[in-house]
């Protein structure tokens, strides 16, 4: 089987982290974000994976090529000279995706969930249509494009309603698909949208179905969702693979701590915390709902809450970081500084309080 991951471009929503590293290589729960997807595809029997990229592919090649042998897959980079949207990349990779008659998976690189690829393939085969969209239920459907089903045929899509003012359903597109190769014939070689241009054609043919996603789902392409998705992922691990979570007397609940990290015995960690390799956490530190990427130092008695701390950053003594603050690579926060919701660009030093949302350049 084959799969295409829509990697895309600059990752602007996840800045300042993506100023230093392409978004797919930003670590989510201590592994590059895209590796979660490559592993799930490989486990479902996918042997050919296409990465559709238009930004810094050379940076990703060396990192991702080493996963080919590990997971027994062929990884091909399909490089766009201009951004082609969400459908154009399928046309660009037509030669690979149409090399046989088997269907192929498509997924957005920002999506983290309990990937149901095996079940999705079986369901797609059973209904005989040309495409299947994975759908997830949301509490506030008025914020999204909602899927409306045909009343006479289970799971057959009748139409899409963008941000409905009245309730028409609560299922939305989860950014995971399986499509037959002939769907590529509906796509032109230009920037185009699979959601607004390709899928409506399949709906008109009565050939597009939904598969309901069980478990959590999150688009982690921006900081607040990255943190929320981390919490959901850890919650899922606690239910399905509790052995993968870190344990200890100073861990409140649901944390992943790299074995190389050094944590003071009287620091308190959790819930919903990820600490990367070679981090050093001092005495009296409290970390809640936060992610620390590799080589970070947090000195004594600081509080880190709802924050992403970028690689090689240092937090001084008696600091308080909160409010979805994001520190880029190699940021230094001096002692006794309060940071609330700031986005701090790489290599900056902060010695004064930042009491409200700001971009520190």
Swiss-Prot record:
It is an enzyme of class 2 (transferase). One of its GO terms (molecular function) is mannose-1-phosphate guanylyltransferase (GTP) activity. Keywords: Cell cycle, Cytoplasm, GTP-binding, Nucleotide-binding, Nucleotidyltransferase, Transferase. It catalyses: alpha-D-mannose 1-phosphate + GTP + H(+) = GDP-alpha-D-mannose + diphosphate. Its EC number is 2.7.7.13. CDD domains: M1P_guanylylT_B_like_N (cd06425). Pfam families: GMPPB_C (PF25087), NTP_transferase (PF00483). It is found in: Cytoplasm. SUPFAM superfamilies: Nucleotide-diphospho-sugar transferases. The keyword Protease does not apply. Pathway: Nucleotide-sugar biosynthesis; GDP-alpha-D-mannose biosynthesis; GDP-alpha-D-mannose from alpha-D-mannose 1-phosphate (GTP route): step 1/1. This is Mannose-1-phosphate guanyltransferase 2. It comes from Candida glabrata (strain ATCC 2001 / BCRC 20586 / JCM 3761 / NBRC 0622 / NRRL Y-65 / CBS 138) (Yeast).
């Amino acid at each position: 089987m084959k799969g295409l991951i829509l990697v895309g471009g600059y990752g602007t929503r996840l800045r300042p982290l993506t100023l230093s590293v392409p978004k797919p290589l930003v670590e989510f729960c201590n592994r590059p974000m895209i590796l979660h997807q490559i592993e799930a595809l490989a486990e479902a029997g996918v042997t050919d994976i296409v990465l559709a990229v238009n930004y810094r592919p050379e940076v990703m090649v060396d990192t991702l090529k080493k996963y080919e042998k590990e997971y027994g897959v062929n990884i091909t980079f399909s490089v766009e000279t201009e951004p082609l949207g969400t459908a154009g990349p399928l046309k660009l990779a037509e030669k690979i995706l149409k090399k046989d008659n088997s269907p192929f998976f498509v997924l957005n690189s920002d999506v983290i969930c309990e990937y149901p690829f095996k079940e999705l393939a079986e369901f797609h085969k059973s209904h005989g249509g040309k495409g299947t969209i994975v759908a997830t239920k949301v509490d506030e459907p008025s914020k999204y494009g909602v899927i409306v089903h045909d009343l006479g045929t289970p799971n057959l899509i009748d139409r899409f309603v963008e941000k409905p003012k009245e309730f028409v359903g609560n299922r939305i597109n989860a950014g995971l698909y399986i499509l037959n190769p002939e769907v590529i014939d509906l796509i032109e070689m230009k920037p185009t949208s699979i959601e607004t241009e390709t899928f409506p054609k399949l709906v008109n043919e009565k050939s597009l179905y939904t598969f309901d996603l069980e478990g959590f789902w999150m688009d982690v392409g921006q900081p607040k969702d990255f943190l929320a998705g981390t919490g959901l992922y850890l919650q899922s691990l606690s239910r399905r693979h509790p052995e993968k979570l870190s344990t200890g007397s100073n861990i409140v609940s649901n944390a992943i701590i790299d074995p190389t990290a050094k944590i003071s015995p009287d620091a308190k960690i959790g819930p919903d915390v990820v600490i990367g390799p070679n981090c050093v956490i001092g005495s009296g530190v409290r970390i809640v709902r936060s992610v620390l990427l590799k080589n970070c130092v947090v000195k004594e008695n600081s509080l880190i809450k709802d924050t992403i701390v970028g690689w090689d950053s240092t937090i001084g003594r008696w600091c308080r970081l909160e409010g979805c603050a994001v520190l880029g690579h190699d940021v230094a926060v001096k002692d006794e500084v309060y940071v609330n919701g700031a986005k701090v660009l790489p290599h900056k030093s902060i010695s004064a309080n930042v009491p409200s949302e700001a971009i520190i350049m």
